[in-house]
């Protein structure tokens, strides 16, 4: 199924729908990591954003839940050049496609993610829409994109319950307003 990434400056990228088949408006950001896509997906700092991965092949080692930075993914959307549909890793428990669907996260594959990253680097972060609606009307969408605000992202990622981790050495308190699990573990 075709998908479209529409940016607030009117730029449109056409690709293939991945994950959930729903429309989202979000702030579009990029990540240049060559590995660690699951860590990116489960990093609370990406809440309220759609993440563009610049590395050209994503998903080749699958989903290994042990590597997650939190219990769930946080981005509103996911943007990749090529999505591996058959991961090869003895630790793999799932595919990114299934992971995105499970958490109702839409995405787009098959676009020039490096061109998108260059555009964002030159013009600054922009809002964008991921949609499968081929009958979109730019004149209606662009004002919505320009008016979009990510909202209260910190409230979404803030820990609501106290957690105690046993360790050696001095006692440390961590106020969790979106901390990755590995911060608490270290």
Q: Whereabouts are the PLM-identified features?
A:
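RNA-binding accessory domains that recognize and position tRNA/RNA substrates
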Residues: 1-186
């Amino acid at each position: 199924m075709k998908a479209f990434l529409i940016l607030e400056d009117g730029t449109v990228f056409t690709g293939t729908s991945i994950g959930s088949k729903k429309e989202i408006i979000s702030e579009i950001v990029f990540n240049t990591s060559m590995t660690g896509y699951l860590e990116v997906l489960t990093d609370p700092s990406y809440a309220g954003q759609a993440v563009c991965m610049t590395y050209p092949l994503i998903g080749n080692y699958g989903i290994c839940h042990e590597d997650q930075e939190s219990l769930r993914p946080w981005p509103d959307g996911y943007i990749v050049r090529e999505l591996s549909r058959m991961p090869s890793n003895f630790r793999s428990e799932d595919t990114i496609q299934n992971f995105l669907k499970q958490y109702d996260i839409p995405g787009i594959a098959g676009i020039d993610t490096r061109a998108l990253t260059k555009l964002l680097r030159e013009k600054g972060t922009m809002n964008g829409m991921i949609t499968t609606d081929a009958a979109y009307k730019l004149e209606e969408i662009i004002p919505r994109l320009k008016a979009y605000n990510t909202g209260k992202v910190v409230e979404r990622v803030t820990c609501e319950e106290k957690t105690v981790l046993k360790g050696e050495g001095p006692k440390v308190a961590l106020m969790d307003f979106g901390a990755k699990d590995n911060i608490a573990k270290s």
